[in-house]
Amino acid sequence: MAVPKKKTSKSRRNMRRSHLALGKVNVIVDSQTGEYKLPHHVSLIDGTYNNRQVVTKKIETEEEVA
């Protein structure tokens, strides 16, 4: 089993971990619904992208649900 020859210092350990920090999520306000969404993604609320309808929601009937 591999064992380190020298103890890793707190400074070196923390410098290694500095790349693991999470970054901010870039969100924008949708112009039609006013909800937050990711840029360059289809709106999950109404299925629009670039002010155009690209996804139509399937309306579930009571027979399909049961």
Curated annotation (Swiss-Prot):
Any matching Pfam family: Ribosomal_L32p
InterPro entries, A to Z: Ribosomal_bL32, Ribosomal_bL32_bact, Ribosomal_zn-bd
Entry GO terms, CC: large ribosomal subunit
GO molecular-function terms, A-Z: structural constituent of ribosome
Ribonucleoprotein recorded as keyword: yes
Any one biological process term the GO annotation gives: translation
Keywords: Ribonucleoprotein, Ribosomal protein
Keyword Ribonucleoprotein: yes
PANTHER family xrefs: 50S RIBOSOMAL PROTEIN L32, LARGE RIBOSOMAL SUBUNIT PROTEIN BL32
Similarity comment text for this entry: Belongs to the bacterial ribosomal protein bL32 family.
The protein's name in its UniProt record: Large ribosomal subunit protein bL32
Annotated source species: Rickettsia bellii (strain OSU 85-389)
Organism classification: Bacteria, Pseudomonadati, Pseudomonadota, Alphaproteobacteria, Rickettsiales
